[in-house]
Curated annotation (Swiss-Prot):
GO terms for biological process: translation. It comes from Psychromonas ingrahamii (strain DSM 17664 / CCUG 51855 / 37). Keywords: Ribonucleoprotein, Ribosomal protein, RNA-binding, rRNA-binding. Gene3D superfamilies: 3.30.300.20, Ribosomal protein S3, C-terminal domain. GO terms for molecular function: mRNA binding; rRNA binding; structural constituent of ribosome. Pfam families: KH_2 (PF07650), Ribosomal_S3_C (PF00189). NCBIfam families: rpsC_bact (TIGR01009). InterPro entries: KH_dom, KH_dom-like_a/b, KH_dom_type_2, KH_sf_prok-type, Ribosomal_S3_C_sf, Ribosomal_uS3_bac-typ, Ribosomal_uS3_C, Ribosomal_uS3_CS. Part of the 30S ribosomal subunit. Forms a tight complex with proteins S10 and S14. PROSITE patterns: KH_TYPE_2, RIBOSOMAL_S3. This is Small ribosomal subunit protein uS3.
C-alpha cells in the first residue's frame, strides 16, 4: 500500500520555512529545543480561543523572539495590550532570557489548514454532521481562491460502532510536486464516542524559485600564487 509522506517535512527548505530558526552548540541545543516545546505548549493552551495558526521562534543574541500567527489578534493582545504583556513576562521566565512577542494576523483563515482543521473539529464536538462540516470547509476554501483542498476525518463517525475514515476533495492536491505550496495540518475532535482525527491539505498554487536564499558573508579572497615555470 502506498503511504503518504508528511507534506511539510518533504518541503522543508524548498517552499516551507522551519518553525524554529536558531543555532546552538551541543551544550545548549537540547535545552533550547525543550524550551521551544514548552513555549508552544504554553501558548497553545493559553490561546486556545484565539484561532492560533502557528508559532515561530527565533533566538537572536541571548533573547527569544516569538511570532504568533492568529486570525484574532485582538484576543491575543487584550485590552490596551495587557494580555500580550503577561504572555511576554511568562515566556521570558520560562526561557530564562528577555522575550519579544510579535503578532501576525492571518487574513484568510479559510485558506489556513490549521484553522480549517480546528474549525471542523470544533463543529464535530458540537455534534454537527461530519459531511456537512467537511463540505462547508471545502466550499469556503475554493470560494476564496484555493487551487484545491482535501479534507479527511477518521474515527467513530456519527457514533458508529466500527471506526472508518472518509475524505472529500475538490480541485488539485499534488502531493509529490515539491514546488506546490501545500498547507497541511491536523486536529482532534474529542467526542463522547472517542477521538475523531481531522486532516486538511490546501493547495494554494505553485511557488517558483523556492525560499529566498540566506546569503553568507564572503571571505576576502586570497591572492593567487603564481605557479613556477611561467
Amino acid at each position: 500500500m502506498g503511504q503518504k509522506v508528511h507534506p511539510n517535512g518533504i518541503r522543508l527548505g524548498i517552499t516551507k520555512a522551519f518553525s524554529s530558526t536558531w543555532y546552538a552548540g551541543k551544550k545548549d541545543f537540547a535545552a533550547n529545543l525543550f524550551s521551544d516545546f514548552e513555549i508552544r505548549k504554553f501558548l497553545t493552551e493559553k490561546l486556545k480561543n484565539a484561532s492560533l495558526s502557528k508559532i515561530t521562534i527565533e533566538r537572536p543574541a541571548k533573547s527569544v523572539r516569538v511570532t504568533i500567527h492568529t486570525a484574532r489578534p485582538g484576543v491575543v493582545i487584550g485590552k490596551k495590550g495587557e494580555d500580550v504583556e503577561k504572555l511576554r513576562t511568562a515566556i521570558a521566565k520560562m526561557a530564562g532570557v528577555p522575550a519579544q512577542i510579535n503578532i501576525s494576523e492571518v487574513r484568510k483563515p479559510e485558506l489556513d489548514a490549521k484553522l480549517v482543521a480546528d474549525s471542523i473539529s470544533s463543529q464535530l464536538e458540537r455534534r454537527v454532521m461530519f459531511r456537512r462540516a467537511m463540505k462547508r470547509a471545502v466550499q469556503n476554501a475554493m470560494r476564496l481562491g484555493a487551487k484545491g483542498i482535501k479534507v479527511q476525518v477518521g474515527g467513530r463517525l456519527g457514533g458508529a460502532e466500527i471506526a472508518r475514515s472518509e475524505w472529500y476533495r475538490e480541485g488539485r492536491v499534488p502531493l509529490h510536486t515539491l514546488r506546490a505550496d501545500i498547507d497541511y495540518s491536523t486536529s482532534e475532535a474529542h467526542t463522547v464516542y472517542g477521538i475523531i482525527g481531522v486532516k486538511v491539505w490546501i493547495f494554494k498554487g505553485e511557488v517558483l524559485g523556492g525560499l529566498p536564499l540566506q546569503v553568507e558573508e564572503q571571505q576576502p579572497s586570497k591572492p593567487k600564487r603564481k605557479s613556477r615555470g611561467k
